[in-house]
A protein has these predicted regions:
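C-terminal transmembrane-bundle signature of multipass membrane proteins
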Residues: 138-192
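Alpha-helical transmembrane segments in multipass membrane proteins, preferentially the mid-helix core
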Residues: 104-121, 141-148, 176-180
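Helix-coil boundary and interhelical linker segments in multi-pass alpha-helical membrane proteins
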Residues: 23-35, 80-95, 148-160
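Generic alpha-helical transmembrane segments
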Residues: 38-45, 72-76, 94-113, 168-173
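Hydrophobic/aromatic-rich structural module bridging two neighboring secondary-structure elements via a short loop
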Residues: 36-72
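Membrane-helix boundary/juxtamembrane motif in polytopic membrane proteins
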Residues: 96, 114-139, 187-191
Length: 192
């Protein structure tokens, strides 16, 4: 099994675990934010599974992933609306926040580096996987920000709402544009 496949299997497993975690915690706390994130991670898991399952049908994978990233911007818009109107975040212990920050920043750093490297590649599978990773990492940064703004003092309620709306909207646009880019870009080879 090559390194890329092992990495995709690991991220698929973590997406499924995150989806179950957010679903159970969302049901337990009655948090629409967590339930919406659970739906996001379940759909992302399906997309990663389809990429693994149908990797020989690259044209299908590009189109499917492009449309799914565009559709994933819908629950992301829901999370932004929820964070503005109802659920501005949960206060967490400083150690948990440091761990979340380390995880989110590592995730976004690797996603950006791998996306830049994949841009030179003609492999549709590789570019598709990197687009999925960047969308996933962007959501992690948004979730981190939501928790940090309420866990650490210094910002007023209005400022928190503005920050959540701004970054959340940017994450929605990123997911949408990553999907649209896959649909419009025909430069990738149809062989891996």
């Amino acid at each position: 099994m090559d390194r890329t496949l092992k990495f995709v299997l690991a991220t698929l497993t973590s997406n499924i675990a995150f989806a179950i975690y957010h679903l159970l915690l969302g049901l337990y706390t009655s948090s629409w934010w967590l339930l919406t994130l659970a739906s996001y991670y379940f759909v992302l898991s399906i997309v990663r599974y389809v990429v693994l399952r149908y990797k020989s049908k690259e044209d299908f994978i590009i189109r499917f992933t492009g449309w799914m990233l565009i559709l994933l911007s819908v629950p992301l818009v829901g999370t932004v609306i929820l964070s503005v109107l109802r659920d501005r975040g949960h206060e967490l212990h400083m150690i948990v926040m440091i761990a979340m920050a380390a995880y989110a920043f590592t995730k976004i750093t690797f996603a950006i580096i791998k996306l830049i490297k994949a841009r030179r590649s003609k492999s549709a599978i590789l570019v598709t996987l990197r687009n999925i990773s960047l969308a996933d990492a962007s959501v992690s940064i948004f979730a981190l920000q939501r928790s940090m703004l309420v866990s650490f003092e210094g910002m007023r309620e209005t400022e928190i709402v503005i920050m959540n709306a701004a970054l959340g909207s940017a994450v929605c646009v990123i997911a949408f544009l990553l999907g649209a880019n896959l649909l419009r870009n025909k430069k990738y080879s149809l062989t891996n």
